[in-house]
Amino acid sequence: MVITLLNLNKKHYLLILFFILLNGCSIDKNIILNKKQKQHKIFNLPITHTSKETHNFNYQDNKQSNNNYLEPLFEDYKPRNVGDILTIILQENTSASNSVSNNSIHNGNSNFDIDIGNARAFDDPNGILNKIELNSSIKNNFLGKGSSSANNTFVGLITVIVDRILPNGNLEVSGSKNITINDGIEKICFYGIVNPHTISKNNSVLSTKVANTNITYISSGPINIGSKINWLQRLFVSLFTLSK
């Protein structure tokens, strides 16, 4: 065997090396089946997401799941199956402003003349009643202005799960995160449609590149309660608004 290897030239060595590398790009069928069974055990639980439907991750019954679980040696990992995870980089920054101005001026004048005729019949030698003139004028000015502005910034990270694979290959993802700090609870929910081509090599995607995005942020605790006005203050605010 040693003599045979020594008699091989460089071309034969390159050919052997090529087949070794080619073997590294393939996986045994038994490994694939074992991987499917492990994933089936992990994800065969009903999980509630932010979407309206509750999905049961059963790979054997889900016809929309891609059965290709091969992970090539020279390819970056990207989610391509139901149950795969994906990191969403939240970078939402919205700004809106509105300004309204209305200026209305209305002027009106009216003249009304009455010619009585012979002033002597009314015992008016000076002719005061000879002609009576009535004048009236109306002037109405209205000036109104209004403006509003809003700025919202949302930055963070959340990891979501692929719920469904659309016919065109896009991924429907959703996920939630609960954070408890002292007595305060913060919950972030995310839902959207991800194009696999926008996923980076580190398995993340910007929230600005996700379609049909639905981001919900809910906070509860002493700080949230303290920021709300009580019923008595709301009553005074309502009365003050009606008095205007």
Curated annotation (Swiss-Prot):
Localization: Cell membrane; Bacterial flagellum basal body
Annotated lipid attachment (N-palmitoyl cysteine): 25
Record's signal peptide: 1-24
Membrane topology designation: Lipid-anchor
Keyword Lipoprotein on entry: yes
Gene Ontology biological-process annotations: bacterial-type flagellum-dependent cell motility
GO CC annotations, alphabetized: bacterial-type flagellum basal body, distal rod, L ring; cell outer membrane; plasma membrane
Lipid attachment in record (S-diacylglycerol cysteine): 25
Main location: membrane
Single GO MF annotation: cytoskeletal motor activity
Alphabetically ordered keywords of this record: Bacterial flagellum, Cell membrane, Lipoprotein, Membrane, Palmitate, Signal
Subunit: The basal body constitutes a major portion of the flagellar organelle and consists of four rings (L,P,S, and M) mounted on a central rod.
Family affiliation: Belongs to the FlgH family.
HAMAP family: FlgH
Role according to the record: Assembles around the rod to form the L-ring and probably protects the motor/basal body from shearing forces during rotation.
Protein name in the entry: Flagellar L-ring protein
Species for this entry: Buchnera aphidicola subsp. Baizongia pistaciae (strain Bp)
Lineage: Bacteria, Pseudomonadati, Pseudomonadota, Gammaproteobacteria, Enterobacterales
